[in-house]
């Protein structure tokens, strides 16, 4: 999703424990289990993206689940799936997987 000159990256997009039918946008093998706001923020920083963080917001289709909390507005023209795959890969490096 594009918003105010950037791309929205919900934590749900990266979460391997959430099925694609509920919001994940990258392959399960690429996604990471239960990413945190801090991990995604660190990954975006390491990858050199400019971003804004909205940790209190909930992914509308999963408003009732705590793990669906938080999104980032990434200043980029790349597709969200491309950004999500890079961030997931960086989170794997951070976790040492």
From Swiss-Prot:
Keywords: Cytoplasm, Ribonucleoprotein, RNA-binding, Signal recognition particle
Assigned GO CC terms: signal recognition particle
Family matches, as SUPFAM superfamilies: SRP19
Molecular functions per Gene Ontology: 7S RNA binding
Top-rank taxon: Archaea
Matching Pfam families: SRP19 (PF01922)
Gene3D superfamilies named among the record's database cross-references: Signal recognition particle, SRP19-like subunit
Any GO BP: SRP-dependent cotranslational protein targeting to membrane
Coiled-coil ranges from the UniProt annotation: none
Entry keyword annotation includes Electron transport: no
Record carries keyword Methyltransferase: no
Localization in the cell: Cytoplasm
Subunit note: Part of the signal recognition particle protein translocation system, which is composed of SRP and FtsY. Archaeal SRP consists of a 7S RNA molecule of 300 nucleotides and two protein subunits: SRP54 and SRP19.
Task performed by this protein: Involved in targeting and insertion of nascent membrane proteins into the cytoplasmic membrane. Binds directly to 7S RNA and mediates binding of the 54 kDa subunit of the SRP.
Family according to the record: Belongs to the SRP19 family.
Name under which the protein is recorded: Signal recognition particle 19 kDa protein
Organism: Pyrobaculum calidifontis (strain DSM 21063 / JCM 11548 / VA1)
Gene name in the database record: srp19
